[in-house]
């Protein structure tokens, strides 16, 4: 469960990007945060896996306070994040190597990594792409590889920070299909978007305003 109480944050003491946000997200929920540019929705997303810390208030992930530095990696393991530009997350030449990168750095045994890669690619509809070069993929395929790389680390919560905003309609459709399948399997989804049709897929929607 994600619990946010009175979360406020500003960049360099400027106008607050977040001002007293109170929000709960339940386990297994598909939750969407909708808003325009500058509304603070991406800033809020970065608080959910401790990339940013609140100036005031608290963010708790399964009871863990994100301000507790001893829990930072546990928080990030629980909350996997997919960003706007997949090229910023892809690190390897081949798809299977990219998806394996996270588990390898966590020290997961090789045999288990192979299974995690298979399951992650299956979850995003990219079985058969293992030996494809990442640079040759479409934007939508790249984003699904980035998603698979996060899934291979087995997070409990998936955060998508404007993950579809750089994709064409076909790519967005493929990403949403993967998200629906993951949600059907019980994963908590937090989607940050400005697309109304994506928000319509969610169980609940919070609207952030500038």
Language-model features: where?
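Conserved ABC transporter NBD signature motif
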Residues: 57-67, 75
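Conserved ABC ATPase signature
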Residues: 133-137, 141
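The feature captures the beta-strand-to-loop junction immediately N-terminal to the Walker
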Residues: 34-36
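Catalytic Walker B motif of ABC-type/P-loop ATPase nucleotide-binding domains
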Residues: 158-161
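Helix-to-loop junction immediately C-terminal to a conserved catalytic motif
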Residues: 49
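Conserved ABC ATPase "signature" region
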Residues: 111-129
């Amino acid at each position: 469960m994600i619990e946010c109480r009175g979360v406020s944050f500003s960049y360099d003491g400027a106008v607050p990007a977040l001002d007293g946000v109170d929000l709960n997200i339940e386990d297994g929920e598909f939750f969407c945060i909708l808003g325009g540019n500058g509304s603070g929705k991406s800033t809020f997303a970065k608080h959910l896996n401790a990339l940013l810390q609140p100036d005031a208030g608290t963010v708790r992930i399964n009871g863990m306070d994100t301000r507790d530095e001893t829990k930072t990696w546990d928080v990030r393991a629980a909350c996997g994040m997919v960003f706007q530009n997949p090229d910023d997350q892809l690190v390897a030449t081949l798809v299977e190597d990219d998806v394996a990168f996270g588990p390898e750095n966590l020290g997961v045994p090789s045999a288990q990594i192979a299974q995690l890669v298979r399951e992650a690619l299956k979850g995003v509809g990219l079985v058969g792409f293992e030996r494809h070069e990442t640079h040759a993929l479409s934007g939508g395929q790249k984003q699904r590889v980035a998603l698979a790389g996060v899934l291979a680390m087995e997070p409990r919560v998936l955060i998508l920070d404007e993950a579809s905003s750089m994709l064409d309609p076909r790519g967005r459709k493929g990403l949403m299909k993967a998200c629906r399948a993951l949600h059907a399997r019980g994963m908590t989804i937090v989607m940050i978007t400005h697309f109304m049709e994506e928000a319509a897929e969610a169980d609940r929607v919070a609207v952030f305003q500038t």
